Structure formats: structure tokens, C-alpha cells
Amino acid sequence: MKTYTGKTVDDAVSKACLDLGVTIDQLNYEVTLETKGLFSKKAEIACWTVEMVQEYIENLIRKILTDMQFEVETVSYVQDGRIYCNINTSNNSILIGKAGIILRAINLIIKNAVSTTFKKRLEVSVDINGYKEERYKKVASMARKFGKTVLRTKADLKLDPMPADERKVMHQEIAKMDHLKTESKGEGKNRYMTISYVD
């Protein structure tokens, strides 16, 4: 985050926008100081842009993984309000882990670091060599298969526990099918979902 001061909050915001080359809509800020004395006024803001968050994420990932002796390249982009960062490396299997467990841990570390640094919960997704994208395609395919089974049998289907992002893909895919509804149940790593038939 960067800090800017001015006689008023608006003044500090204007300085930040000018310096960072962004519009006020692209600037996220919080007022850290505002005094209104008889002889002097002063305001201070701490601010950031999405581009600053992207740079922070890429730098943090590279630092963590290069310290662990991995050679990596990172590419980030923003889509639908979510920040995506893809890690390119020759050590995918090690960094992804069994069933993606290491990749989920990396995501958790990065999300927590971003929330702490920028004092806001932001949607962040870290992938390694397109693993999650391929995994989501498989999950979507499974969802269609499970949906057809429930439509045929009209019996509820309970799925094994899965990560939140994969459950989301399941929910979205089933929502495209008529006469079906989904529900998430359970807590933490045991959270699972059910698919039910509805008239």
C-alpha cells in the first residue's frame, strides 16, 4: 500500500490518482488520519490498486518458491473481479501435491497474505501450469454425469467432500440442468454437497 497526505481527504485522493495514473474508481483507500484544527488541516490515506495487488501476489509467490529452490515464472490477470495468478514451473507435480493439496495450501497462504496486507478480503486464485483449469473441466463433466444419474433415478446423491472452489463448479454446472438442486453440508474439510431431484 502507498500513503498520501493532503489538506483534505479529497486532496490526498487526487494526489494518489495523479501519481498512480488511475481514476478514483480504480483506487481503493482508507483514511488513516484526518485532523481539522483551527489553523491546520491534514488528511492521510493508505491506498492501493488492483495492479498493486497483482504485483504483490506475483512477487510473494516468486519469493516463497525461489527460496525453496524452485524456478518459477508467474502471470496474473483480472477477470470478473477475481485476481488469477498462474505459476509456470517444471516441478508441477511437487507443487500441486496429491489431489492438489499443496496447491490449496499455496492458495491459502497467498489469500491470507493479501487480506492482511491490503486489509480487504479479495478473490484470489493461484494455479500451477493450468492444473486447476483442467481439474474444473473434469469436475464439470462429473457434475453433468451425476446430474443425469439423479434425473434418471430421482434419488438424492451425496458426493464425497471436496474443496470449496470445486463445489462451486459443481453447483454452477448442476444449476444449468432442470429439475435439480444442490446443497452444501458439513463443516471444514468434511464439507460436501448433495444433488436432489425437484419437480
Model regions: which residues?
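RNA-contacting regions in translation and RNA-metabolism proteins
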Residues: 1-199
